[in-house]
């Protein structure tokens, strides 16, 4: 359970940073366009001081925004959280595989204990590497898992990818 939750939270945090990056770029482009327009207006009409003042204010805002967002490398933050989400997903799948092998009886008790220890060590290592997330990412993950059932796959969805003879719900 924890692996699935942590995976989804990391995924949602990566989405947040992606959206922040997109909005930041749009704002930067918009302000750059306004600054350029103001400079062109000054060149065309050198006598109007309003263009000069407005352009100076926009340029100052642009500089402030650029300096502020230089502190945040949203692309790198997004990448880090995506990579961590994948690590948690792989760990969850490894636990699922262990449970399947236990149910199938293909592992001895010693093998189960050894694999469980290995997975626990991986869990500890990944936990140490996992970056902190926001409360918003947690809430979006909660909605995705509890309400939207993001991690639940129906038999119908599984059957789509199987050959006809392996499907549970044959047509």
What is each model feature region?
Residues 56-63, 83-89:
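Hydrophobic alpha-helical segments of small multi-pass membrane proteins
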């Amino acid at each position: 359970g924890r692996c699935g939750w942590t995976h989804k939270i990391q995924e949602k945090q990566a989405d947040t940073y992606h959206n922040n990056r997109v909005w930041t770029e749009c704002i930067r482009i918009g302000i750059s366009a306004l600054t350029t327009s103001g400079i062109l207006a000054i060149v065309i009409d050198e006598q109007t001081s309003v263009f000069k003042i407005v352009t100076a204010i926009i340029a100052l805002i642009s500089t402030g925004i650029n300096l502020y967002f230089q502190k945040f490398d949203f692309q790198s933050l997004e990448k880090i959280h995506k990579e961590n989400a994948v690590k948690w997903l792989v760990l969850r799948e490894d636990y699922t595989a262990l449970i399947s092998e236990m149910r199938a009886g293909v592992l001895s008790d010693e093998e189960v204990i050894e694999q469980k220890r290995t997975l626990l060590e991986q869990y500890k290592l990944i936990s140490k590497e996992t970056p902190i997330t926001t409360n918003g990412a947690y809430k979006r993950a909660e909605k995705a898992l509890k309400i939207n059932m993001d991690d639940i796959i129906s038999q119908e969805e599984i059957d789509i990818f199987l050959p006809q003879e392996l499907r549970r719900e044959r047509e």
